[in-house]
Amino acid sequence: LKTFRWTIFFLVLVSASLQAQDRPLLDISIKAFDANLPESSLDQQQSGIYPAVRQAEVRYLPSFLKLMLEESGQWGAVRLLPDLDTGAELQLSATIVSSDGSTLELAIRAIDASGRIWTDKIYTGTAVESVSLNEPVLGTDPFLYLYTAITGDLLMVYQSLTSQDLQGIKDIATLRYGAALAPDVFSPYLNQDESGLYQLTRFPADNDPFLMRIREIREHEYVFIDVVDEQYEDFFVSIKPVYDVWRRYRREMLASEADKVRLEQEQGSDFRRGSYMSLRESYNNYRWSRLQDQYLDEINAGFINEVLPTDITLEDSLFHLSGTLDEQYKEWRGILKELYMLDNPQTP
């Protein structure tokens, strides 16, 4: 806890230092986390993984990280997406290594548009019940220290870059987005070396018609991203109360199991069927089973918005998107690419 307080103090100092500087702010694109879910139900059971909870964490955990980054005030727009963002200035992705309510392990990778890796490691946190910071949402998460470590690492890299570096990242992101739609037009502006890093060969003029159209198409994509973001936010708000309780009871269950093992070792044959401790253990298991069924039902109910269709108006046309958010996002990007090609039939 002492280390946690010093980390918070350090971030406050870094934040104050950065606010005093006139530097370009990078937008962050966060991909919904990889569930890392074993294929067989037996493997899931042996690993103590509940599929409904893990699928909820795929959305919940990045939503909390997004909130942390936004609250720091040191970034541009922070967006949570169902897939990787081809035009991301700073792309963040993660795999849930383990999550049992008591400990949380996330394999985090952050890479900017130039190919520079900001962080690529596993962050591990142990639940801290007493975390508060007088924050109604941020301060109630038992793994706040883990998220603070992630945001702190990102801020350290950001602070190490010059304004020219940051603007270069933003320009490369724009051109990489353009190259995904019209490679023949925008790829010549970029050079990728053997290590995978991108450099600008030159940047098109601001009044370049292709660049202007790409920027317009990008804004159209943000329209759908705003819809996705709203759905993720609704999911986060609706699932947080039951997820918090579920994690707390998971910690209690794990502690109870540890106590049982300890008592069995201490008491040996005295810990027998029909004894008070054995009966209490049976009751706790029954109680946990009933509570778990209730919580899993509520968590499953939180996915209702995941498959709701989306209607979006674009340039006097109405588009109806259906399927999961991931499927809708891919469909929308396909529509935007077709729109670009229709507007630029002579694209080389």
Regions found by a protein language model. Give the residues of each.
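An acidic helix/loop motif centered on a single conserved Asp/Glu
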Residues: 30-70
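A short, hydrophobic beta-strand-centered structural micro-motif
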Residues: 28, 77-108
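Sec/Tat signal peptide C-region and signal peptidase I cleavage site
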Residues: 16-20
